[in-house]
């Protein structure tokens, strides 16, 4: 049970993505249209060479902001092979359409794995 799921239908889930193309964002997770999601764990692992990694939260729910509004979760972190960054102990709340993206750079053949655990709380329609 989380802050937002008390007394509501909710489900915990884990997601994974591999970012393997330089300077191209890979979407780790997108919050569904009928949910609010609480991210309780985020793990970023470098599996190949020396790579710079950006992890961003793409905010889809701010109509007055530019369409490319994003917030940096991990900004230009230089990671050598085997390095990882683990975020726990805090909660990031995503609204419908929000996403978490991972973008590797500075390495011709990057391999960055991203894993997250979220609790999706269903938003009643109507």
List the model feature ranges, each with a label.
Residues 19-24, 74-84:
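Solvent-exposed, conformationally flexible loop/turn segments
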Residues 1-36, 59, 96, 104-126:
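C-terminal interaction-tip segments
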Residues 37-46, 99-102:
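A short beta-strand element within beta-rich, extracytoplasmic domains
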Residues 81-97:
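Beta-sandwich interaction modules
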Residues 48-75:
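Short, surface-exposed beta-strand/strand-loop-strand elements in extracellular ectodomains
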Residues 47, 90, 105-107:
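Beta-strand repeat scaffolds of extracellular/surface proteins
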Residues 40, 51-55, 110-114:
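Short beta-strand/loop motifs in extracellular/secreted proteins, especially
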């Amino acid at each position: 049970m989380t802050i937002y799921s008390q007394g509501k239908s909710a489900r915990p889930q884990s997601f994974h993505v591999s970012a393997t193309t330089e300077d191209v964002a890979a979407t780790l997770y997108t919050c569904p249209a009928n949910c609010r999601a609480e991210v309780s764990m985020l793990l970023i692992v470098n599996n190949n060479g020396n790579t710079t990694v950006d992890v961003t939260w793409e905010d889809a729910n701010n109509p007055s902001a530019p369409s490319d509004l994003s917030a940096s979760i991990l900004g230009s972190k230089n990671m050598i092979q085997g390095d990882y960054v683990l975020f726990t102990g805090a909660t990031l709340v995503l609204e419908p359409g929000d996403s978490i993206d991972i973008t590797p750079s500075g390495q011709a053949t990057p391999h960055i794995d991203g894993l997250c655990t979220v609790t999706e709380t269903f938003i009643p329609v109507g």
